[in-house]
């Protein structure tokens, strides 16, 4: 999606390039649901029982997300040093930049998603309280949808904010995080049902996805995407098919955050190759640019995560840097 939006030479117009690919930007909403579900798997019971301290909980969150993001911020600042990029880089490095009233950060622009998710991490103990039981969880989901709607149509006007409220805002994104938490509360029953009726579950997901594109959804604000992405996660919980359960999917999921954060850097690298000099078909040029961007991002993410960071961690453990 980002490649298509930034390409000077656009691919031909069709249902794929005009409707489907632009919708890929909403996958960040799916990742919010998955983030909430995975956080609940790891910390929901531990937070409720007090089995983990705040220091350990937040240290783990920084340890997981900060190193690679910080490296990308440093690279971006080095490429374009200025007072503006310094201020934005500083905000990025705190991981708290979504607490700003109108965060419009261009240094690692795609990092807005990480900022929103990290705000969710900050609120996770409160989130655990809100989802203390299934009944309360449904009530919270309903209230979050109402609050999201009010935020968009009332508080999202120029009288209150500089720009409309969107995915960057935690109130807008809250229903997706809550949905992930509710799916966690029902995980055992969902897993059992999908395992027994996987064809019905898969067909339901496909129908919902198709309806998302063929039905007029204006006026339904976030509900269509919420239903589609929640359905796919519920299917994934009990799915045993090769599409979602294979070595490639498992490998890519391990570096998905890194790929997301660095892919625009490799789009710029791909642009420097001037592939348009060798490929004169616009559609093929788009495919080639996507492939070079994706391959570069995957290779870079793999090397940094599994080699560079491991070597640095090993060196620090041995005290080579006096730590």
Stretches with model-predicted labels:
Residues 78, 177, 204-310:
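Alpha-helical transmembrane segments of multi-pass integral membrane proteins
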Residues 4-11, 79-82, 152-161, 210-217, ...:
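Juxtamembrane "helix-exit" motif on the non-cytosolic side of transmembrane helices
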Residues 47-56, 83, 127-138, 185-197, ...:
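Membrane-interface helix-boundary motifs at transmembrane edges
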Residues 33, 37-45, 120, 124-132, ...:
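Hydrophobic transmembrane alpha-helices
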Residues 21-34, 41-80, 84-96, 120, ...:
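Transmembrane alpha-helical segments and their boundary/interface "anchor" motifs
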């Amino acid at each position: 999606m980002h490649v298509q939006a930034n390409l000077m030479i656009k691919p031909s117009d069709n249902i794929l390039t005009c409707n489907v690919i632009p919708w890929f930007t909403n996958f960040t909403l799916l990742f919010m649901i998955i983030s909430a579900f995975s956080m609940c798997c790891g910390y929901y019971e531990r937070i409720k029982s007090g089995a983990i301290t705040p220091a350990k909980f937040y240290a783990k969150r920084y340890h997981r997300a900060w190193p690679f993001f910080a490296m990308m911020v440093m690279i971006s600042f080095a490429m374009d040093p200025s007072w503006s990029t310094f201020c934005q880089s500083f905000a990025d490095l705190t991981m708290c930049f979504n607490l700003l009233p109108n965060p419009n950060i261009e240094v690692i622009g795609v990092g807005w998603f990480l900022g929103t998710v990290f705000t969710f991490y900050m609120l996770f103990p409160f989130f655990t309280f809100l989802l203390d039981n299934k009944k309360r969880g449904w009530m919270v989901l309903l209230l979050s949808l109402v609050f999201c709607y009010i935020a968009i149509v009332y508080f999202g006007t120029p009288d209150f904010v500089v720009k409309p409220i969107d995915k960057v805002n935690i109130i807008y994104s809250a229903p997706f995080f809550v949905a992930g938490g509710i799916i966690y509360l029902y995980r055992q029953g969902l897993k059992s049902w999908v395992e027994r009726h996987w064809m019905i579950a898969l067909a339901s997901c496909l129908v919902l996805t198709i309806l998302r594109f063929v039905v007029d959804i204006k006026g339904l604000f976030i509900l269509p995407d919420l239903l589609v992405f929640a359905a796919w996660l519920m299917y994934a919980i009990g799915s045993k098919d090769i599409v979602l359960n294979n070595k490639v999917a498992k490998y890519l999921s391990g570096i998905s955050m890194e790929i997301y954060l660095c892919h625009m850097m490799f789009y710029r690298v791909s642009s420097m190759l001037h592939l348009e000099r060798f490929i004169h078909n616009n559609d093929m040029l788009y495919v080639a640019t996507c492939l070079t961007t994706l391959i570069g991002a995957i290779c870079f993410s793999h090397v940094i995560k599994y080699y560079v960071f491991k070597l640095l961690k090993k060196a620090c453990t041995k005290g080579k840097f006096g730590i």
